[in-house]
Design a protein with these regions (language model features):
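Membrane-embedded alpha-helical bundles that constitute the cytochrome b-like, heme-associated redox core
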Residues: 2-221
Length: 221
């Protein structure tokens, strides 16, 4: 009696192997969770309110009525809000899984693009308002005061470098310019935003009215 090849474990035909082969598992992006999105939006709005309140409560009526006081206040306000929004903007594209579960990667990218123009515009306004405010207080010209701020105030020069980096990132983000650049170059320059935020940090703590004399606020920020 001849032995059956199947009984002795002979190799199965390709067709038999294909019938039992299971597809390889695929990685799926985290699905958006609307409930988490609403909570995150509430937290972000609360943070914005706290930042605004810190700036407003740091000013007194006498400071506002002094020469250049209004410009200085507007400079502080735009600086604080602009920095907060810049941090939010970076967080949106940080690829942190917990963050991506809130709105999904595509939704976060759309939010990032919607938020992006605001921090750069506000921080540019911050520099202009403060220069005008300090110039009015010193009864000096704006250009002269700009030079004084850059050379005689601590950490302002590196903050100006940070603002320049942010403006460069804003320029290359314009669609007409972005499409003409190699994606690798565009992405590498975008990573400089982390450097810009780090460079801008010292002058906020040393000179910001919301931080000077407020150690708890410094630690939280």
């Amino acid at each position: 009696m001849s032995a059956s090849p199947v009984a002795f474990g002979a190799p199965k035909s390709p067709a038999a192997r294909n019938r039992k082969r299971k597809p390889a598992p695929t990685m799926e992006a985290p699905r958006p969770r609307p409930a988490l999105g609403k909570i995150a939006l509430l937290v972000a709005g609360l943070g914005l309110g706290i930042v605004t309140a810190l700036t407003v409560t740091a000013e007194t009526s006498s400071q506002l009525s002094a020469p250049g006081g209004l410009f200085t206040f507007l400079g502080s306000l735009t600086g604080m809000i602009g920095t907060y929004l810049a941090l939010i903007m970076v967080l949106l594209v940080s690829r942190i899984p917990v963050v991506e579960r809130v709105a999904g990667q595509d939704g976060l990218v759309r939010l990032h693009r919607a938020v992006a123009p605001w921090p750069i515009s506000l921080l540019a306004a911050h520099a202009v308002f403060l220069t005008l405010g300090y110039a009015a207080a010193a009864r000096a010209g704006a250009w002269h005061e700009a030079g004084t701020l850059l050379t005689k105030y601590p950490d302002v020069l590196i903050a100006a470098v940070a603002l320049g980096i942010m403006c460069l990132i804003g320029i290359i983000s314009v669609r007409a310019i972005r499409l003409r650049m190699p994606r690798e170059t565009w992405w590498l320059i975008h990573l400089w935003m982390y450097l810009a935020l780090a460079l801008a940090f010292p002058h906020e703590i040393v000179l910001g009215p919301s931080f000077v004399g407020h150690p708890l606020t410094q630690v939280v920020w």
